[in-house]
Structures are given as structure tokens and as C-alpha cells.
Curated annotation (Swiss-Prot):
Belongs to the anthranilate phosphoribosyltransferase family. Catalyzes the transfer of the phosphoribosyl group of 5-phosphorylribose-1-pyrophosphate (PRPP) to anthranilate to yield N-(5'-phosphoribosyl)-anthranilate (PRA). Homodimer. Binds 2 magnesium ions per monomer. One of its GO terms (biological process) is L-tryptophan biosynthetic process. It catalyses: N-(5-phospho-beta-D-ribosyl)anthranilate + diphosphate = 5-phospho-alpha-D-ribose 1-diphosphate + anthranilate. It comes from Buchnera aphidicola subsp. Baizongia pistaciae (strain Bp). Anthranilate 2 binds at R165. This is Anthranilate phosphoribosyltransferase.
Amino acid sequence: MKIILNKIYQGDTLNISETYTLFKSIMLKKINNIELSAILIALKIRGESQNEILGAVKACLEHMITFPKPTYMFSDIVGTGGDNSNSINISTTSALVGSACGFKIAKHCNGNISSKTGSADILKKFGINIQISPEKSKKMLDELNICFLFAPQYHINFKVVTQVRKILRIKTIFNIIAPLLNPAMPKLTVMGVCNFKLMLPIAQVLKTLNYHHAIIVCSDNIDEVTLHSFTKIIELKNNNITSYILHPDDFGVKYCHKNDILGGNTEENYNIIKKILQGKGPSAVTETIAVNVAILFKIFGYSNLKKNTEYALKVIRSGKVYEKIIQLSKF
């Protein structure tokens, strides 16, 4: 372990095996908080490599509580967070809309660690119990098209890690690997990252993890599709990786201002999202949600982004998504 730590502190890159060994030690609490802080900061300053991401994921997956495997195709829609954009919870809102559109979503979620408001914080405000058994979560997915897998419940060895991350209050390798640690282990995902440089390494990791179809998005260093800038896409499909750029007119909507998607604390985000899901939200933020849902449609085989966006807007404006919220809160 001393050799591995010295490599990190000297700015050298670890291979998959070394990273696996390191993160195995972290999971087994063999690394103290001071060492862990130094490791996370050193990796962040140098930049995490593809092999380090993969090694960390493999180690963490071995210590995860499992989820009953569905027999049907389902997806996650998730972001790394830590982009300091102070936007509303776009992926969480998009997941709810996607489920109301008929798609199965196993949403990996967490509380606020490196952002003001985490997905779990919003879901709790809506009265949705995210701390239910894996079996009951699976039933929720079966019956209501969506379930929420609360990270601390499935990754119990992350408790010490979470404490350190909350103290550091910066984006670390755990932001990068968290979307890759969904306990349901979907083969479809829409994953947002807040750094263009991370997109291809993550696509390669998803390929190694045998994802069937994945779309990685990044726009203006925000881990979502946005309408105030172009969005870079890297798509993994049938083991082939392609990249392209999307603009708002590809979705049939107009550019908006970055401030249009700003949120705030949990209460403020809750109020904004509630209006959106009731079909009463401002057009710019509603359309931002719709274009993210349009990308979700794409991994289920619906490739026409304009039609996808149009249908998502129709569902949002109907208020059906808020009806879904009520069902989920009673589950």
C-alpha cells in the first residue's frame, strides 16, 4: 500500500490492479481520514485516469448490497454532480418525467454532498420514501416504472468516505464513479459529467462494464443537456463509441439563458420542480427537462429528438407527472 500511496503523491497514474487494491482498502476502512483526504485531493489535482475509474468501480461494486435483477430493460439517468452550476435537480426531474412517459427507471440517488441539494433531498420533500428494502423498490419499479436506490443504503462502506467528502466540499473521484455504482446494474444509462475530458474515459469504462447503450452528456461544464449552450454527446451503442454535438434546434426548442435553470436550496428547488411537474413551470426550464428526457428516449430506441421532446413536453404540461409523484408518495 505504501508503494501505491507514494505513486499517487508523486503524481503518477495507477493501473487497474493498484486502484482496485487501494479502493478495496478504503472500503475495508484500512485507510484513515487524513490519508483518504490526501488521496482524493491528489487524484483531483492530477486528474483521474480511465484505469483508475475502472479499478475504483470494480472494488466498490464488490462491497455493494445487491438489487433484485429485473427481467426487462431499464435505465438510469444520473449525473456526477459537483459542477457548481446551482441548477435545479434536472436528472431527478427528468427521471420522474421519463417514468410517466412509460420508461422504466432505476434512479441511483444521494443527498447533498458536493452540491446544495441532492436528488434524495428533493424526493424526501415530495414525501417519497427512498429508504425501503430492495424487494419493495423492485416492486415500485415493476408497478410505477421508477424506483429510487439511496446510495448509503446499498453502499454501507461509504459512510467514512461521505464524512470526508462533506468536509472537503469538492468534486472527487467518488462523484465520477457514483453514477457507475447503481445497485440495479442497468445496461442502459444517460450519464451527465461536468468535464468534457471525462467523457471518453467514462464511455470506455461503460463499455468494459458491458453497457448496451449509454449516452454521456456535458454542456458548458454542466452535467446535463442545457439550452444556453451546445451539448457534447458521447454515445456507446453495440460496443461502438461515437461523438457529436447537439444544439437546442436539434430538439426543436430555442436557446435560453443560463439563469433560467438556476435553483437554490432544497426548499427552492422543490417549489420550482413542483410547478414543472404540475405543468405550470416556466417554459425555459420545462423545455430543459424535456430535452434531457428526449435523450433518455433515445437509449430506449426512439431516435427522433424533436418528436421525443414534443412528447415529453406534452406529458409534462398535462400534469401527469405530478400524479405519479402522489402515487410514489403513497407506495
